[in-house]
Amino acid sequence: MSESRAADAHILSVSIVAGPSAGAWLQQIGLSRKQRRLILPRGALSADANHALEQISAIADQGKVDHLVVECDSATPAMAYASLFLSPPLTDIARLATTVLAIRASDLLNLLVRRVASPELGSPCFIAEQLELVDHVVLGGAKDDPDLKLARNISIALNPRAQVSDLSSETAGRLLDNTESMSFDFGAALDGSGWRQLIDGEKRPHNGGNAIASFAYRARRPFHPQRFWTLLQGGLPSVFRAKGFFWLATRMELVGGLNLAGSELHCAAAGQWWAARDDHARQHEMPERTRKEWHEPFGDRRQAIAFMGLDFDADAFKEQLDDCLLTDSEMSAGPGSWATLSDPFPSWTAHSHTHECDHDHEAGDHECCHH
């Protein structure tokens, strides 16, 4: 046992590897000269916190492993496993070092850009959300594969904080041999996705790099439900990722959450606007970031959606979104009149919140959109 291992009192370092190519990448890993490594193949580690604790405790107690590599099953996101390491008792015996998503460049483009469905790859939103939260993205493909450059640029747009590399035995060995100096940062993962940075104003709108364009759409008046619905039903063919929240004129109480990746689009309730809550809740529970966004007479109600697209005219698309907003005459009619507007969106309830947006709708540090 190494001195550093003894100093850590048998704290086990753990890496989580997810994605359609996770198994292929892990097969390339050879023996490590730096540490004793154990790979748990897909489905071997339970996503149930209590069962996972028992499994990892048994491995740690044996004292024969320095580094545990967990391959996610196709139905469980990497963050579901990562969240197990947020608090004791698991943090007393194991430390999450890093998270990895492995996928072929062509598969990523098929899901997000070419919109080619594949049951083996999973849903576009599932893959996009995993990519946005990991530390490392590993792309498969030949070195002369034209898909590699575009897939790399899309990965960086989705997750600016991630290290993007090729799927090779050298990459695997180099990454997993240095876990002693790594520590997965949950806060950075939640705040570091490209869409989140765009909405928060921490990432500048981007144009270039294989014709990728990104921007955050913001407005302080509601969408006409029928016009916005019609725009969305067009499929937004040039957009490969969109996420954020929106305000429908007919729904003054509830936040609309939008989540698009490739051809997959979800719109659902994402909590309640703070402006629709009572004075006591706003005074004592409303987050500071929401207070900074507050504007009378409608409070925190607004549009804030990040869009990323390929070969599309961002300015023209912004005009399309502007056309979905209420006109001056519609605005002057007031909320009573807005309630009678045609609204083809499915009905929402406050309890149908599915974490589709980044809206501070509860007290504390709960964050939407981070599964």
Task: Put a short name on every predicted segment.
Residues 45, 108, 116-297, 331-371:
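C-terminal accessory "lid"/substrate-recognition subdomains
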Residues 35, 65, 94-98, 133-135, ...:
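Short glycine-/polar-rich loops that comprise or flank the Walker A/P-loop
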Residues 1-51, 67, 71-72, 77:
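Glycine-rich P-loop/Walker A and Walker A-like loops and their local beta1-loop-alpha1 context
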Residues 23-26, 145-149, 223-227, 312-319:
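Short, conserved charged micro-motifs
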Residues 231-234, 317-325:
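Short amphipathic alpha-helices in soluble, non-transmembrane regions
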Residues 15-19, 40-41, 69-73, 100-104, ...:
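Conserved beta-strand segments of the P-loop GTPase G domain that flank and frequently precede/overlap
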Residues 92, 96-110, 117:
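Long, charge-dense
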Residues 49-95, 101:
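Phosphate-binding/switch loop-helix module in NTP-utilizing enzymes
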